[in-house]
Structure formats: structure tokens, C-alpha cells
């Protein structure tokens, strides 16, 4: 009986029935044939080609006998090739070729197994087993596990196929065996090959013995010299008087480590003693021993528990950042009362440049501990965290243990920087590997693949940093104590610039500390109009630029002792035209124009929202590059206004007579989020009723269809934007009232803050009567 199958030609390999083999496939036709077989869940006909170098063999360039095989697994590799795992099933022969556009397809006929008589079959099987075992033990080209596996095979057909697949034969010889029709004939051919190989192996053994006996005098002298040196090492009399092995033994005895680690390193040392000095395995074992001995198993920093001293160090090094400072001082206070306290696992989340990484160093300094840092940005290989298994060439411990080895103590402050910037690929997920590192219940027995021993990380004070929680998996977030760091206010930036950044840049550019002075107004101008960021990195670069401009001016004018006093108006002389401007409150009350408050990664901003009405049929148009959430918020605001038409004294069918256009200026900047809901609703109400909106008022809050005002985030940044934009009155959701305690007093005192819970209260506060424009 014949059947049609896709065909894949093979180079330099013959697949036998019962043989499982991985194949790396690059030819397009072969890939299509594999995918077709996988998709249709059919077998594929694997046959060896006559010339391995032929790229596109035709029917006459392949053998006629092959193996019907099952495609067990397909994996597409980054270079476009496919790795396939196949298992041979039955022998078959090509009957004819069947035309196909994408790959070779043939009609094949399965080969029927012709078995000898029972007694003859038993004799064949015994001889084959005996010859194969002799060959395996004499030639040492076949592993012991293969011999054991073959000894458990009872089916003589399978036994012959498996033995032939493991013999070190050429493709041509294996093809000859595959094509023999009868089982007896195949076993006879195999026995002939095995006996020939046994004779060759015996000849090779005799030749080796003769070569060794004919070693030259110089070689014998070298051999004896090496032996004498080894004997001297055994009695501890090497070149320097102390044998290397003895030195390692002394280090092991002196090293404080757990009993299981000591037992492992002693076992490896014993193995090392019996290895030749020039062996590649010697280097591997020595590196492993050095790794174990280099780890700080029980060595700890003494540290200091003086809370007042720690607070002084933190305040000296960093301005602001109250939340992380408070958490560290709490930890020190508890540690002074508890003998053994597991290190916490903190996660500082905030925009770039606010000092997340640098405060980690200050924390280590304030606690009297060593500091280790590992950048996780761009990490995509799980083995970078857990290490590679020792079976791999060039294997080494993971980055966590290498950092511990470098820092030299078991209780450092360990900063895992940019934890949200890791990625995943076919080599694994580094975030999943960190689950054990950052779990207080598990990290006391962290198991690195290379070390293969439990290592205690429970005394490490882990701090991770991230710009956003979005890139961190939920299970990893659950293991960490999240501390949100907001951007600096303008006042904060001024203080940081005056106390830290400007003195640092003066020193870096060769100035004395009083050579350059910026007035408060000048510093505010630099902060407000030459930087737009949540942190202070850009501010430091601007101050560095100013110092360079002053240095050049001094040199050109020949006045090296001149003191520079820079006022607000002279800043553009050194830094050029201001780069940024911030939104300001409108100068007069307008109909259909309201001021909202938004929060971005670089701080708070004023958000102007405009609405105009046009004769039409009730179409609502939204422009200004609004995101999906903001568009839905606008739809909810519009629906609320329609539901309140009677209270707002609007005609019930007003929406059928006008088209409404809602626009948020600065259309090049994407905008999203629900917090503009009450602002949009107020603007719609103003445009439809003709009542102007107070120009000195700003608002923020999410709206529901029933008019409830829901809480928002980024409160401090939004209020700062209002203060900076000359806003005097702000409407906030009532539920955000509890968050006002975290807002600096100098911001709250400058604003008239009103808490609202319903949209009716917003309209009452925001809308003026008709004709009352100011």
C-alpha cells in the first residue's frame, strides 16, 4: 500500500526507525515540508542525499530508501533557521514523485520486515549484543549509558536500528544497512562492520603501546622531571616551599563557611589533586573552588545603629526624599531592638534624576555597610541572575553572587538598578529568577546554578529602583515594599542647585566657591525656563554649561580674579533664549474655556480645554491627540451634561441642533487619563449655557455618569503647576483631602483649595452668571 508524504532531504545523517534526533534546518523547502507535516499532523519522509553539498537535490540526487518519521517539536531560531526534533518510525521506499510547488512530495511504500526463524533470530541477537559490548568497551567511542540502554531493548528489530544509529559510521555505510530488506541480512552486515572495527581498534591499541615504548630520551627525562616535582609537592616542598594544594587547604581551614560548603570545597580539592596540571578540567575545578572561597559566607559589616547620626548623613547627602529616609531610620530603630532582623526589600519608583540610585549609596553610608550595585537595564538572560551550570564552557556564577563576592560581606546594601528595564526572550525571564532573590522567605537559601549550593541572602538590604511599575511583573511587585518618589518642586530644585549642584560644578570647572553667584530670581529662571524634568540631571548640565561660559568669558577678557554676579535678566546672556515656557492662568473669564491640571513624568502642567458650538446634528468631536481613556472621560462628561439639561436650563433636545468640538491645545503632545473629566464637563456646561468660567480657577478630578467626582494622582505636582501658573483657586476631589498632608505647606498656603464630591459643586464654584466676565 502506498501513501503520499512530504519529503525532506538530509545531509550526512541517516535516520533509523526508533531513533530520536535533533535537526537544524535552513533550506526553505525543508522548512515548509516540516511545517506542513506539523500542521497536518502527518509523518514526513526523511531520506539522505547523495552529495551533502547539493543545496536543492532532485529525485535522482537522493537515496530511494528512507524513514517515515514523526515531527515531535519545532522551534524557530533568531537567525531564521528551525530546530526540529524528529523520531523515526518505519522504513519506506520511494515509488514516485508527486508535484508540489512549495516542497518535495513523494509517494512511498513501507518496507515489510522479513524475520528469520526463531532459533536463528535468538542467535543473531546474542552475537549482535556481544559484539556491540566488546566494541563499546574497547573503542571507548560509545558511552556506558548507551550500552545500558541497548541491553534493555527486547525487540531485535529495534535493537539493530538503535545500535546502527550509535555506531561511528559514514552516512554511506549506514544507508547500506538501512536498505537491507531482511532483518537477518541487516544484523549480518552490522556484525561484519563491528568485527572490522574491533580489529582496527586492536591494531590502534598495539600501535599506541609501541609508540609509548619508543619515547625519546628527552621525553622520558621530561616525564621523570614532572614526576619528581609532583612528589615534592606531595611532601610540601614546591618551588616556593609551600605547595599550592597545601595553601588552598590552609585557606579552607581558615575560611568561615557552613559545613555543607566546606564539605563541597574539600571534595573538589581532592578531585583537583588527581588531575594533570595542564588539563582543561583543572582550570574549571580551580575556578569553582575560588568562587566558593571568594564568597562572604559569614563575614558581615559591623554597621552602626545611631539613628541621629544616620539621619544627619542622609540629610547632608540628599535634600528632600523624606519617604525613603524615614523608612531607613525606622529599620535602624527596629534593628537596635532586635538581635537578628531580615533585610527589607524596598523599591524606589520615580522619574529619572530624582536621586533613587544615589540615595542608595547614602543609605549604605548611614548604616555603616558596604554598597553593591547591579544594573538590570536590558538584561534578558535568566542565567545572568542564576549563573550557568558548570557543564557549560566558560560557566560562571550569576551577577548577584559575583557582586557579593566583590563587596566581600554578607550584609551589604544591594541596589538592583532599573528593575523595570529587563526583558524576556528564549533564554528565560530574569524577572522570574529575581523572585527567589527578592523573597524574604526564600532568599536565605538562594541556589545559583553554577555554585549549586544554598547561599544566604537574607541579611542583604535589597533596594530596587524603577521609573515605573508597569514593566515589573505583579509577583515581583508583591515581594517588594513600594516607595513612590515624586519629582522635585521648583523650590526643591533651587535649594538643590544652590547647596549641591552649583558648588559641585564650580569645583569641577576650576572656580572658587564664591566666584559665581546666582540670585534667587536667576536660579528660578534657570530651573523654570531652561529645564523641564522631574529630577535634576538636566539642571546640573545647564549649570555646567553656565560655568563653562563664564570660564571662557574670564579667559577672553583676561580677568581671572573677576567675580560674577548673575541676575535674572542676565541669564539669557550665558544660556541663550529660554527653552521652555509654562502655562499661565487666563487674563479674563471666558465662555467655553477652562483650566485643568495634568501630571506627566516631568511634573505637573496646566491643561487648557476649549469647547465651541456649531449648528449641526449633535456630533461630538474630540481633538488634541487624546488617548482612549481621555476620550471616554469626555464622552462621560457629555452624557452627564445631557442628563442635567433641565437643571442647566437647556432645551431638552439641544444636542440635536448643535455640533460640539472639544479641543485640548498643544496637539503634538499625546494626552491621556481620566482626571480631566470635571474640566471637560465644566467647559461643556459653560459653552452650552453661555456662562463664563473663572479664569483664576483650575480643577482636576474624574467624573462618573452620575456626576460623582473621583480621586486623582500626582496631587503635589498638579498643585505646584497651579501655583507656578498664577492660579489662586483649585477644585480637588473630596477623597484627595487626606493626601493634602503630603503636600508642602508653602504650596498649600499659596492656593485656595476647595474639595468637591459632586459635579454640581464644581459648576457652582466655576461658572459665573452671564455677562459677568472679568
From Swiss-Prot:
Residues bound to ATP: 350-357
Catalytic residues identified in the record: 675, 718
Enzyme class: hydrolase
Gene induction: By heat shock.
One MF annotation (Gene Ontology) recorded for this entry: ATP-dependent peptidase activity
Domain Lon proteolytic: start-end pairs: 588-769
Domain Lon N-terminal: 5-198
Record EC number: 3.4.21.53
Keywords: ATP-binding, Cytoplasm, Hydrolase, Nucleotide-binding, Protease, Serine protease, Stress response
Subcellular location(s) per record: Cytoplasm
Primary localisation category: cytoplasm
GO biological process, one term: protein quality control for misfolded or incompletely synthesized proteins
Reaction(s) catalysed (UniProt annotation): Hydrolysis of proteins in presence of ATP
Gene Ontology terms: cellular component: cytoplasm
PROSITE patterns in alphabetical order: LON_N, LON_PROTEOLYTIC, LON_SER
Keyword Protease part of the UniProt annotation: yes
Biological role stated in the UniProt entry: ATP-dependent serine protease that mediates the selective degradation of mutant and abnormal proteins as well as certain short-lived regulatory proteins. Required for cellular homeostasis and for survival from DNA damage and developmental changes induced by stress. Degrades polypeptides processively to yield small peptide fragments that are 5 to 10 amino acids long. Binds to DNA in a double-stranded, site-specific manner.
Similarity-based family: Belongs to the peptidase S16 family.
Matches recorded under HAMAP family: lon_bact
Subunit annotation: Homohexamer. Organized in a ring with a central cavity.
Protein name: Lon protease 2
Organism whose genome encodes this protein: Desulfotalea psychrophila (strain LSv54 / DSM 12343)
Amino acid at each position: 500500500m502506498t501513501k503520499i508524504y512530504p519529503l525532506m532531504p538530509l545531509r550526512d545523517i541517516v535516520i533509523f526507525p526508533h531513533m530520536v534526533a535533533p535537526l537544524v534546518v535552513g533550506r526553505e523547502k525543508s522548512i515548509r515540508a516540516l511545517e506542513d507535516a506539523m500542521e497536518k499532523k502527518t509523518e514526513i519522509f526523511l531520506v539522505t542525499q547523495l552529495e551533502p553539498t547539493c543545496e536543492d537535490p532532485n529525485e535522482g540526487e537522493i537515496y530511494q530508501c528512507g524513514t517515515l518519521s514523526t515531527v515531535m517539536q519545532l522551534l524557530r531560531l533568531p537567525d531564521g533557521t528551525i530546530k526540529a526534533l524528529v523520531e523515526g518510525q518505519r522504513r519506506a521506499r520511494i515509488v514516485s514523485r508527486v508535484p508540489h510547488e512549495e516542497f518535495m512530495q513523494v509517494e512511498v511504500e513501507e518496507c515489510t520486515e522479513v524475520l528469520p526463524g526463531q532459533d536463528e533470530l535468538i542467535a543473531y541477537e546474542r552475537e549482535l549484543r556481544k559484539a556491540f559490548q566488546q566494541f563499546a568497551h574497547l573503542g571507548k567511542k560509545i558511552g556506558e549509558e548507551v550500552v545500558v540502554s541497548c541491553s534493555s531493548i527486547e525487540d531485535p528489530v529495534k535493537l539493530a536500528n538503535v545500535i546502527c544509529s550509535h555506531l561511528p559510521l559514514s552516512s554511506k555505510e549506514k544507508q547500506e544497512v538501512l536498505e537491507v530488506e531482511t532483518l537477518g541480512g541487516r544484523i549480518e552486515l552490522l556484525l561484519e562492520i563491528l568485527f572490522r572495527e574491533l580489529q582496527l581498534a586492536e591494531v590502534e591499541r598495539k600501535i599506541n603501546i609501541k609508540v609509548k615504548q619508543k619515547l625519546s630520551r628527552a621525553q622520558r627525562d621530561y616525564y621523570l622531571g614532572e614526576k619528581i616535582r609532583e612528589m615534592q609537592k606531595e611532601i610540601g616542598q614546591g618551588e616556593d616551599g609551600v605547595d599550592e594544594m597545601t595553601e588552598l587547604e590552609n585557606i579552607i581551614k581558615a575560611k568561615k563557611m557552613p559545613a555543607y560548603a566546606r564539605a563541597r570545597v574539600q571534595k573538589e580539592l581532592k578531585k583537583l589533586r588527581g588531575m594533570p596540571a595542564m588539563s582543561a578540567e583543572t582550570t574549571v575545578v580551580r575556578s569553582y573552588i575560588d568562587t566558593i572561597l571568594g564568597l562572604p559566607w559569614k563575614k558581615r559589616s559591623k554597621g552602626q545603629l545611631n539613628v541621629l547620626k544616620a539621619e544627619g548623613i542622609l540629610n547632608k547627602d540628599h535634600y528632600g526624599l523624606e519617604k525613603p529616609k524615614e523608612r531607613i531610620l525606622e529599620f535602624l530603630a527596629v534593628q537596635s531592638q532586635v538581635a537578628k532582623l531580615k533585610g527589607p526589600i524596598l523599591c524606589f519608583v520615580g522619574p529619572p534624576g530624582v536621586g533613587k540610585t544615589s540615595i542608595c549609596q547614602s543609605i549604605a553610608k548611614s548604616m555603616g555597610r558596604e554598597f553593591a550595585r547591579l544594573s538590570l537595564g536590558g538584561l534578558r538572560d535568566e542565567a545572568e541572575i542564576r549563573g550557568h551550570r558548570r557543564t557549560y564552557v566558560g560557566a560562571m556564577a550569576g551577577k548577584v553572587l559575583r557582586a557579593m563576592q566583590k563587596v566581600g560581606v554578607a550584609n551589604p546594601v544591594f541596589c538592583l538598578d532599573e528593575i523595570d528595564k529587563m526583558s524576556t526572550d528564549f533564554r528565560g525571564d530574569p524577572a522570574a529568577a529575581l523572585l527567589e532573590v527578592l523573597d524574604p522567605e526564600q532568599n536565605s537559601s538562594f541556589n545559583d546554578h553554577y555554585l549549586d549550593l544554598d547561599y544566604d541572602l537574607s541579611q542583604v538590604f535589597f533596594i530596587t529602583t524603577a521609573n515605573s511599575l508597569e514593566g515589573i511583573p505583579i509577583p515581583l511587585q508583591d515581594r517588594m515594599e513600594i516607595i513612590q518618589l515624586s519629582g522635585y518642586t521648583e523650590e526643591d530644585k533651587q535649594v538643590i542647585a544652590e547647596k549641591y549642584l552649583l558648588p559641585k560644578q564650580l569645583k569641577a570647572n576650576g572656580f572658587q566657591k564664591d566666584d559665581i553667584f546666582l540670585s534667587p530670581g536667576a536660579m528660578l529662571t534657570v530651573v523654570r525656563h531652561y529645564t523641564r524634568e522631574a529630577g535634576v540631571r538636566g539642571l546640573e548640565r545647564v549649570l555646567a554649561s553656565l560655568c563653562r561660559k563664564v570660564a571662557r568669558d574670564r579667559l577672553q577678557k583676561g580677568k581671572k580674579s573677576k567675580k560674577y554676579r548673575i541676575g535674572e535678566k542676565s541669564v539669557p546672556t550665558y544660556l541663550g533664549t529660554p527653552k521652555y515656557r509654562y502655562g499661565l492662568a487666563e487674563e479674563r473669564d471666558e465662555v467655553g474655556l477652562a483650566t485643568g491640571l495634568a501630571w506627566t513624568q516631568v511634573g505637573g502642567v496646566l491643561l487648557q480645554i476649549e469647547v465651541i458650538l456649531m449648528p449641526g446634528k449633535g456630533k461630538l468631536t474630540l481633538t488634541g491627540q487624546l488617548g482612549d481613556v481621555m476620550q471616554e472621560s469626555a464622552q462621560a462628561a457629555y452624557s452627564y451634561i445631557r442628563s442635567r439639561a433641565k437643571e442647566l436650563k437647556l432645551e431638552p433636545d439641544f444636542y440635536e441642533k448643535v455640533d460640539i468640538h472639544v479641543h485640548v491645545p498643544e496637539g503634538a503632545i499625546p494626552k491621556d487619563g481620566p482626571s480631566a473629566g470635571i474640566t471637560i464637563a465644566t467647559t461643556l456646561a459653560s459653552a452650552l449655557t453661555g456662562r463664563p468660567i473663572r479664569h483664576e480657577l483650575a480643577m482636576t478630578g474624574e467624573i462618573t455618569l452620575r456626576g460623582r467626582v473621583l480621586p486623582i494622582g500626582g496631587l503635589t505636582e498638579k498643585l505646584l503647576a497651579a501655583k507656578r501658573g498664577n492660579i489662586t483657586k483649585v477644585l480637588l476631589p473630596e477623597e484627595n483631602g487626606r493626601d493634602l498632608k503630603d503636600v508642602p505647606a508653602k504650596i498649600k498656603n499659596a492656593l485656595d483649595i476647595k474639595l468637591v464630591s459632586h459635579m454640581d459643586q464644581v459648576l457652582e464654584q466655576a461658572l459665573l452668571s452671564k455677562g459677568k466676565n472679568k
